[in-house]
Amino acid sequence: MLNIDLQYFAQLQDAAGRAHEIRTTSAPTAADLYDELRDVYSFALEPACMRVAINAAFSPWEQPLRDGDHVVVIPPVTGG
């Protein structure tokens, strides 16, 4: 099991009801972690319309996760 430091913004933060959490997971990749989070928080956004950053660097969704990683899922910017 991995302990992942997660940060949420915009509509993801609203859906999760928090901006930050430490989550214990067995997800091997960022994509698998997002699938897990979608099940928990009913996130509506598809990964294809967002970016993921792992340890302050943009990363592919298939990036393997390591214990202690800081993961930020960045939704599209909206507003006017």
Regions found by a protein language model. Name each.
Residues 1-79:
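Ubiquitin-like/PB1-type beta-grasp interaction modules and other compact soluble beta-rich domains
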